[in-house]
Amino acid sequence: MKKTKMLSLLFAAALLTGCAIAPSQSKESKNDGTSQNQPVSTPNSEGDKTSGGGNTSQGGDNTSQGGGGQGTEGAFTFDETELNTPQEIHTTDQKNYLNFSKPYYSITGSDLNSFNATGASSLQKSSWAPKSVTVNWGFTAPSGKTVSKFQFLYGQYSDLSDAYTIEGTTAQKISFVNPYLGDNYFKVVANFSDGTKEESPIKIFKVDTQAPRNLDVGNMPNCRDMGGRATYAGGKIKQGMIYRTAGNKFDNRSSIDSDCQTVLTKQLKVKTEINVANSTGNNVNLSGTNVVNAFMAYGATPYSNLARNSVRIRQVMDVLADESNYPVFYHCRIGTDRTGITGVMINGLLGVPFNEVIQDYGFSNFSPIDNQRYPGKTPDNNGDDIKKYIDEILAMPGNNFQEQTYNALLSIGCQPEKLNTIINIMTEGTKADIQIKGVVGEGSTLSSTGNKKTSTDYKNPATYYECSSGKEVSLTSSFTAGEKDIVVYLGGSDANQSTKFANCVTLKIDGAEQTISNSKTLHTAGFGNTQQDSRIGYMFNILGKYTLTAGNHTITFSVKSGTFNVGTLSVFDHIVASSN
């Protein structure tokens, strides 16, 4: 998709989107004749109504922003000091949580309680919703004119080609929710009773830049924009592109209300819904959206969590690698567990620093999610928690959490081209230049004495080898000298709790057998019935750390007992993240 079309999608999500930019910068303007939309009504966090709508494209009205003090712009006046003072959208409790002084990976229930982030089902909207912002102006009507109403238009771009219109009254102020983080371009339109209008110049009001941009989406809790955060590389994640939300029947009984539908369709302009719950009953099914069901397992057998959901994670990444699918919202039921897993993978891939990845996960505790969630805490005592997923990623080689996430995704069969596409779509400013630190051998490229199979079944990788006793797969490539992590991504149906995985397989380098340091049993490695529909349990497994000399080498993985489906065989440079 061309850049102008990409911007169209961003503009269409204007009310609940935005991007924090430096005060000295202006977003690129766009004049493509954006279509008109009907006015809509949405609630703010205090329960009153503000009506909006009409994605009005004014095209290139790039009036200078003006200086400080009280400024007169024709009949309009604005307090520049007020406009340039960032407004806060987070409540006191939310802000205190976001400024927590300790690593979020070690946060406790007591810590969360101190912020009133209890996750209790009794939490009200005032706990999770953002605060409203207010913009004031002065206006003197020309002689003989009577103001019938004001309209307030704002957007991310300096020409307001992405503008979202809020229908006001005759009051010379507007209060509303879901502004952008950072700079918001706006103008005011005075509508006179005789049908004529007068417009103010385009100005800027500011909102505090601290993410997340939590959202007021009708009666749906736990909603926020994935954008607005800085990355390891120095860029910033675009807002208005990916949203994490709850699903329909989020409390097992309530359907989303009309305000929620309005926000999602008329304001966010969502095009694609990804349901990562385990039931279509949580589908929102908005008119005009494409629904992708990527049902993820959670709870039950909580081992090899990342890999047992690998097929579904790849499905999510495939959706995000297609620009035509944006804006996207994804959810499970309450937007915390499976949604949290997905959020960790997306934030990690995009280069959000590790501490902020966990911070975003924990922000869900301001919503009624049944009970608290934090690393090490198992929801409903089901034996699963986000820490198991994160620890699998942290075990991968990489200089930081982004590289570790990238390599983990490669190891479960994601294509590097698609991962890079997602990074490019979602990043503004400096983009991460991730170089694969090793060789990933997909099933289609491996040499094998096993039975090669190509499958469109979601239970298996697209191409894999079925290897039983005496069968093998091998990868021959040129390597740089140094320590390497050898990783195999495979599935198996045997979930024996005492049989060691290392006793069932063999690893050779140039024909010489190697010691496998992995000490997991087949059960703890995640094999067997660990996903829905009795699917085979896929996992990635680090076999160990090995030293290679520079030049060509052949890595061979073979089966001594049992049967395994081999999806990838990967060799990564051994890199330990010094800091996340």
Specify the residue positions occupied by each region the protein language model found:
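Sec-dependent bacterial lipoprotein signal peptides
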Residues: 1-17
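Glycan-recognition and processing domains
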Residues: 20-30, 74-110, 432-480, 569-580
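Ser/Thr/Gly/Pro-rich low-complexity, disordered linker/stalk segments of secreted
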Residues: 23-73, 449
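Cys-dependent protein tyrosine phosphatase-like superfamily
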Residues: 69-328, 341-437
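Conserved structural position at the C-terminal beta-strand
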Residues: 190, 557-559
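Extended extracellular/luminal ectodomain segments enriched in beta-structured repeat modules
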Residues: 480-489
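Beta-strand-rich ligand-recognition modules
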Residues: 491-552, 559-574
